[in-house]
């Protein structure tokens, strides 16, 4: 029997047989001239090449198993590689909390001209701060909570005109604060707290600077006048600092030096000129194009082969070979027309050992088995603190989401099965139903339906998002409120019925109706993982050292933060910290803006359809702040929240809008359900 040959090999062999001398000449010609051409015309590295070279610099780069050289980091807006942020190209790198060690070398990433965000927070990198000023298009740099040390050069941030957010907190940096920080024209947020910076604070003149944190350093001298409206807590822990908002300086204190910032002196290189150079470039480009075409043919073949792999390749082979049986609450039939296992709702005692089988909790969906998932075309949707999510399109036409959990080891097998059965009984238009699950001691799979409009977070925070108008945002908030209230009613024995409420755990269907995901999983999660990562444990009441624990009102607090996130378009950065940090709280920022009578600046500038809706937007903002009271007993009950949110309207008529006073309160009976303006800034005044 003739051995099969791939088309690329067959074509080459045929060409060689027909015209061997010509082929040899072409090969020699290309092999000689291509290196010369490439030395003159540099082809930019691909994002994948840059990322792979960067991975090789990491001491524990072996953890990046999804960074496959045979696959692309991005497929449209979906990331195939862990920690990569995509918008048809790689625009961000988010490798947080991975225990990465050693020195951080960012040089391999410099050719990635579309890179806008770099985040390595909560790792164990040490050594000096990496060089970043060659990333001239960078907008955000997050390096907090590592072990970086040493002085940061004064010009470390020169030539970075787009840089808006810099987080260097909780490292061991020393020396003076680099003067180039003061020259960043678009700086919005700067966090230098928890280091060993010395000397005086430079004069920051940026008008849009909203937050600057210098606490717990060794700084001295007067606080620059441009920063004297900041929260006093931003300067705490520096014994030598003085002047507003701290105590006045003594008469002998020197003035604040204005540190001159040298302009960037870009180096320019003159391109080769003349007819000879032009002809050589033309020939080089032609040869490169020919080579690229040949490479593309080979890559297409490799890509087709790589598509056969999928997200379950990391599972032991035995798992893929097991026969999957349906485990449902009603009698059903499997592929062999034999009755599948059926379990009575009221049965107590030990559940039968599923033996590693896929178990269905719904009977209104077409059955599939693990082999269908193994053969499915899978895409990586993302990787969060709970686990990785995959989109799987199986042969029957169903599109599913499979999520792998590695920290669901808080209960035994029987308790886990019982809880999954309980979740399978939930039925509400704003709850994403569980379809099936797979149990192993080491990790679990939860299978749900795929929602076409991605998560709420992607619409609020992705660079390529068109944004959501007011009507859609209000619709989403109303749906989330009803879904959360349903969980409160159906899961009364759970301390926190949801426990992980945030915008990335809310998906949107084709009509932008919201559905809650990752709900009611706290009983299954390991305590350490839950305390470190679940949003409920970032609430102000969670202070185990003081005996304060979470309650059902904690979910109300999370919902309030979500309301503020939807209205402001700002990401709640306290989710990135462990525990509650009022300095990083979105609630604190909103209250500060209200106290300064800048309520109009709170709302997302990207939100459309705001005309004649200001009253309703302010009313929703008040509801959000009521939900976010630091004292639990002052927060609203969930049913009260739903009632108030349901009363909000999409817009006001001209008459209604004209009947409002300048503070945004109605003069009709509707306002009796809401706060008056004296209560609007409650957390600042009480």
Curated annotation (Swiss-Prot):
<dbReference type="Pfam" id="PF13855">
    <property type="entry name" value="LRR_8"/>
</dbReference>
<keyword id="KW-0547">Nucleotide-binding</keyword>
<feature type="domain" description="Protein kinase">
    <location>
        <begin position="375"/>
        <end position="648"/>
    </location>
</feature>
<protein>
    <recommendedName>
        <fullName>Pollen receptor-like kinase 5</fullName>
        <ecNumber>2.7.11.1</ecNumber>
    </recommendedName>
</protein>
<keyword id="KW-0472">Membrane</keyword>
<feature type="repeat" description="LRR 3">
    <location>
        <begin position="161"/>
        <end position="184"/>
    </location>
</feature>
<keyword id="KW-0597">Phosphoprotein</keyword>
<feature type="modified residue" description="Phosphoserine">
    <location>
        <position position="455"/>
    </location>
</feature>
<comment type="function">
    <text>Receptor-like kinase involved in the control of pollen germination and pollen tube polar growth. The extracellular domain serves as a sensor for peptides derived from GRI. May act as a downstream element for ROS-dependent cell death induced by GRI.</text>
</comment>
<feature type="repeat" description="LRR 4">
    <location>
        <begin position="185"/>
        <end position="208"/>
    </location>
</feature>
<dbReference type="InterPro" id="IPR001245">
    <property type="entry name" value="Ser-Thr/Tyr_kinase_cat_dom"/>
</dbReference>
<keyword id="KW-0418">Kinase</keyword>
<feature type="topological domain" description="Extracellular">
    <location>
        <begin position="40"/>
        <end position="283"/>
    </location>
</feature>
<feature type="modified residue" description="Phosphothreonine">
    <location>
        <position position="472"/>
    </location>
</feature>
<feature type="transmembrane region" description="Helical">
    <location>
        <begin position="284"/>
        <end position="304"/>
    </location>
</feature>
<dbReference type="Pfam" id="PF08263">
    <property type="entry name" value="LRRNT_2"/>
</dbReference>
<feature type="modified residue" description="Phosphotyrosine">
    <location>
        <position position="542"/>
    </location>
</feature>
<keyword id="KW-0433">Leucine-rich repeat</keyword>
<keyword id="KW-0067">ATP-binding</keyword>
<dbReference type="GO" id="GO:0004674">
    <property type="term" value="F:protein serine/threonine kinase activity"/>
</dbReference>
<dbReference type="InterPro" id="IPR011009">
    <property type="entry name" value="Kinase-like_dom_sf"/>
</dbReference>
<dbReference type="GO" id="GO:0080092">
    <property type="term" value="P:regulation of pollen tube growth"/>
</dbReference>
<feature type="modified residue" description="Phosphoserine">
    <location>
        <position position="377"/>
    </location>
</feature>
<dbReference type="InterPro" id="IPR000719">
    <property type="entry name" value="Prot_kinase_dom"/>
</dbReference>
<dbReference type="GO" id="GO:0005524">
    <property type="term" value="F:ATP binding"/>
</dbReference>
<feature type="binding site">
    <location>
        <begin position="381"/>
        <end position="389"/>
    </location>
    <ligand>
        <name>ATP</name>
    </ligand>
</feature>
<keyword id="KW-1133">Transmembrane helix</keyword>
<dbReference type="InterPro" id="IPR001611">
    <property type="entry name" value="Leu-rich_rpt"/>
</dbReference>
<keyword id="KW-1003">Cell membrane</keyword>
<dbReference type="InterPro" id="IPR032675">
    <property type="entry name" value="LRR_dom_sf"/>
</dbReference>
<dbReference type="GO" id="GO:0106310">
    <property type="term" value="F:protein serine kinase activity"/>
</dbReference>
<keyword id="KW-0723">Serine/threonine-protein kinase</keyword>
<feature type="repeat" description="LRR 5">
    <location>
        <begin position="210"/>
        <end position="230"/>
    </location>
</feature>
<feature type="modified residue" description="Phosphoserine">
    <location>
        <position position="545"/>
    </location>
</feature>
<keyword id="KW-0675">Receptor</keyword>
<comment type="subunit">
    <text>Interacts with the GRI peptide.</text>
</comment>
<feature type="compositionally biased region" description="Polar residues">
    <location>
        <begin position="328"/>
        <end position="339"/>
    </location>
</feature>
<comment type="similarity">
    <text>Belongs to the protein kinase superfamily. Ser/Thr protein kinase family.</text>
</comment>
<dbReference type="GO" id="GO:0005886">
    <property type="term" value="C:plasma membrane"/>
</dbReference>
<dbReference type="Pfam" id="PF07714">
    <property type="entry name" value="PK_Tyr_Ser-Thr"/>
</dbReference>
<feature type="binding site">
    <location>
        <position position="403"/>
    </location>
    <ligand>
        <name>ATP</name>
    </ligand>
</feature>
<feature type="topological domain" description="Cytoplasmic">
    <location>
        <begin position="305"/>
        <end position="686"/>
    </location>
</feature>
């Amino acid at each position: 029997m003739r051995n099969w040959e791939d088309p690329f090999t067959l074509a080459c062999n045929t060409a060689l047989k027909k015209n061997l001398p010509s082929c040899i000449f072409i090969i020699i010609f290309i092999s000689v001239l291509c290196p010369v051409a490439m030395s003159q015309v540099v082809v930019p590295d691909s994002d994948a090449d840059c990322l792979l070279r960067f991975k090789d610099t990491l001491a524990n780069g072996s953890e990046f198993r999804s960074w496959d050289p045979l696959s692309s980091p991005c497929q449209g807006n979906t990331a195939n590689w862990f920690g990569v942020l995509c918008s048809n190209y790689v625009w961000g790198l988010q490798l947080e909390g991975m225990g990465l060690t050693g020195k951080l070398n960012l040089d391999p990433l410099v050719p990635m001209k579309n890179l806008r965000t770099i985040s390595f927070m909560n790792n164990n990198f040490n050594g000096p701060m990496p060089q970043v000023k060659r990333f001239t298009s960078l907008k955000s740099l997050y390096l907090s909570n590592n072990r970086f040390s040493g002085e940061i050069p004064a010009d470390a941030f020169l030539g970075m005109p787009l840089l808006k957010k810099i987080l260097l907190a909780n490292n061991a940096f020393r020396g003076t604060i680099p003067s180039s920080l003061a020259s960043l024209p678009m700086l919005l947020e700067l966090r230098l707290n928890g280091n060993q910076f010395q000397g005086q604070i430079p004069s920051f003149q940026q008008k849009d600077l909203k937050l600057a944190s210098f606490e717990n350093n060794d700084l001295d001298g007067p606080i620059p006048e441009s920063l004297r409206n900041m929260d006093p807590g931003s300067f705490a822990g520096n014994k030598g600092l003085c002047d507003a908002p701290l105590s006045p300086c003594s008469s002998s204190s020197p003035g604040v030096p204005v540190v001159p910032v040298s302009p960037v002196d870009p180096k320019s290189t003159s391109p080769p000129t003349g007819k000879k150079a032009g002809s050589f470039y033309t020939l080089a480009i032609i040869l490169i194009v020919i080579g690229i075409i040949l490479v593309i043919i080979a890559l297409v073949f490799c890509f087709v082969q790589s598509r056969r792999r999928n997200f379950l390749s990391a599972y032991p082979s035995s798992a893929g070979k097991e026969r999957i049986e349906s485990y449902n609450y009603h009698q059903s039939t499997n592929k062999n027309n034999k009755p599948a296992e059926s379990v009575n709702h009221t049965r107590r005692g030990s559940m039968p050992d599923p033996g590693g089988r896929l178990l269905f909790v719904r009977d209104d969906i077409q059955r599939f088995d693990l082999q269908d998932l193994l053969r499915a075309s899978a895409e990586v949707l993302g990787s969060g603190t709970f686990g990785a999510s995959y989109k799987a399109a199986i042969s029957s036409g169903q599109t599913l989401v499979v999520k792998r959990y590695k920290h669901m080891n808080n209960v035994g097998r029987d308790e886990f099965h019982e809880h999954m059965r309980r979740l399978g009984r939930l039925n509400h238009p704003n709850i994403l139903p569980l379809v099936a699950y797979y149990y192993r001691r080491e990790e679990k799979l939860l299978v749900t339906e795929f929602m076409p409009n991605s998560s709420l977070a992607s619409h609020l925070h992705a660079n390529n998002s068109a944004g959501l108008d007011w009507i859609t945002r209000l619709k989403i908030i109303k749906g989330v409120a009803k879904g959360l209230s349903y969980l409160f009613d159906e899961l009364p024995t759970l301390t926190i019925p949801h426990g992980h409420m945030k915008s990335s755990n809310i998906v949107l269907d084709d009509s932008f109706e919201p559905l809650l995901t990752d709900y009611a999983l706290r009983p299954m999660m390991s305590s350490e993982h839950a305390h470190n990562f679940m949003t409920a444990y970032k609430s102000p009441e969670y202070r185990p050292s003081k005996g304060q624990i979470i309650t059902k009102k904690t979910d109300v607090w999370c919902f309030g933060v979500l309301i503020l996130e939807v209205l402001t378009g700002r990401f709640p950065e306290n989710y990135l910290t462990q525990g509650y940090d009022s300095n990083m709280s979105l609630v604190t920022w909103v209250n500060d803006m209200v106290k300064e009578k800048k309520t109009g600046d709170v709302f997302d500038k990207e939100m459309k359809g705001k005309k004649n809706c200001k009253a309703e937007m302010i009313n929703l903002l008040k509801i959000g702040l009521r939900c976010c009271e630091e004292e639990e007993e002052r927060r609203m009950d969930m049913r009260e929240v739903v009632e108030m949110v349901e009363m909000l309207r999409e817009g006001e008529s001209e008459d209604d809008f004209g009947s409002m006073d300048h503070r945004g309160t109605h003069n009709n009976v509707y306002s009796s359900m809401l706060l008056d303006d004296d209560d609007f800034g409650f957390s600042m005044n009480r």
